Amino acid sequence: MSLGQLSYTPVTDVGIGAIELYFPQNFVDQNDLEKFNNVSSGKYTIGLGQQQMGFCSDNEDIVSISLTVTRKLIETYKISTDSIGCLVVGTETMIDKSKSVKTALMDLFPGNSDIEGVDIKNACFGGAQALLHAIDWVTVNHPLDKKNAIVVVADIAIYEEGPARCTGGAGAIAFLICPDASIPIDRQFSACHMKNTWDFFKPITPIPSEYPVVDGSLSLSSYLEAVRMTYTYFISKVNRHTTGIDGLNSFDGVFLHSPFTKMVQKGLAVMNYTDSQLRHKQLNGNGVDHKLDENDRAGLAKMIELSAQVWKEKTDPYLVFNRRIGNMYTPSLFAQLLAYLAADDCVTGEKSILFFAYGSGLASAIFPGRVRQTSNLDKIRQVAIRAIKRLDDRIQFTPEEFTETLQKREVFLRSKEIPKSPSETSLFPNTYFLDNMDKLYRRSYTLHEEPNGVQNGNGIHH
């Protein structure tokens, strides 16, 4: 018998069957940051479109937030750990140059070591690639063993003192990937644009640092180029293999990676204009006589004007997490899906959605998905609604306290004192935290539980 000749029934509608979101309890207000940094009023809140920024103290790292969100996913949806055959982590937040975050998550799967997958890294794009990889894995493997996959996208985004510090954030999202999913991803229509750029990177330097090197203008132009190229490739692929798509009009929600929400608005404007050029149609009845250039300020402003209705209906309403948490890196794109699922618009009929994923360096992709009225969709929607409400349960810190917290992270990272113990700061209930680093730099974690099982969501100090 040849193993390659085994026959089985293919699976359909592979995609997201369950979702959980974690974000830290700490946040700082962007209005306060404007005053603290002595910049003009509205520079962060209007110019960048940001309201608040979440951040982690030195007692949370990439492993702790990944443990937290994965455990929440398993418990919320009562997932059997024996049903998982693949676990992939998308992150650019590194605490080890060799050992993957995924290996630490194996502690949550006692008795099941047959779980494929490791970490995937390329700036903010690693999460999208992890999702696509898991979809491929389930498509191939589920017919044989009936096993599903889990994808974790998580990052802690912080910047050194200066103009970019206001664009940080932190968060983690976990997905269950399975057949007959509530949010299937039509992976066969994904299209990508890859290129060697130096718009944002984190070199290994003599002095340990969590901070990236950023070329702001190159980052913007690279992002907009990626939108144009991926959308062009996507429409070309769709037109070659199917009929009936009417560009962006075919989608009820359009989600783009969000370094900050004004960047999303610019990206959508380029996508909308590219859509018009490809279909040779006027936008909102306002045609343009000449080709617009996204790298020209006036041209981009015109694109934004022409895309106002699409922005209002398909993208802007779903940026609540991005505005109030900031740039979570890999989760930033998928936080918009959660906000969309919390809205009343998705409760009737099948909906079509579109994702644009981007990671500096650069890697980018567009892929479509659908929201189906399955038996599990209501559970997912309740998780999304609770996550939005949990934004109001966070603790506000002053800019001075925020700055001190980042200094604590620097001290913890660079201190030669071994073993190390981070400071004690507030956490949401049922959150893992970094407890200790021993003389071999091995990190240990503890689950912070609410006393007596009470979960008030208001945070306590442990």
UniProtKB/Swiss-Prot annotation:
The keyword Transferase applies. Disruption phenotype: RNAi-mediated knockdown results in sterility, slow development, reduced body size, severe paralysis and reduced pharyngeal pumping. It catalyses: acetoacetyl-CoA + acetyl-CoA + H2O = (3S)-3-hydroxy-3-methylglutaryl-CoA + CoA + H(+). There is a cross-link at K408 (Glycyl lysine isopeptide (Lys-Gly) (interchain with G-Cter in SUMO)). Its EC number is 2.3.3.10. It comes from the Eukaryota. (3S)-3-hydroxy-3-methylglutaryl-CoA binds at C124, T167, S219, H257, K266, N327, S360. Ubiquitinated. Keywords: Isopeptide bond, Lipid biosynthesis, Lipid metabolism, Steroid biosynthesis, Steroid metabolism, Sterol biosynthesis, Sterol metabolism, Transferase, Ubl conjugation. One of its GO terms (biological process) is farnesyl diphosphate biosynthetic process, mevalonate pathway. Changing K314R: Reduced sumoylation. CDD domains: init_cond_enzymes. The active site is at E92, C124, H257. Disulfide bonds: none annotated. Pathway: Metabolic intermediate biosynthesis; (R)-mevalonate biosynthesis; (R)-mevalonate from acetyl-CoA: step 2/3. The keyword Endoplasmic reticulum does not apply. One of its GO terms (molecular function) is hydroxymethylglutaryl-CoA synthase activity. This enzyme condenses acetyl-CoA with acetoacetyl-CoA to form HMG-CoA, which is the substrate for HMG-CoA reductase. NCBIfam families: HMG-CoA-S_euk. Belongs to the thiolase-like superfamily. HMG-CoA synthase family. This is Hydroxymethylglutaryl-CoA synthase. It comes from Caenorhabditis elegans.
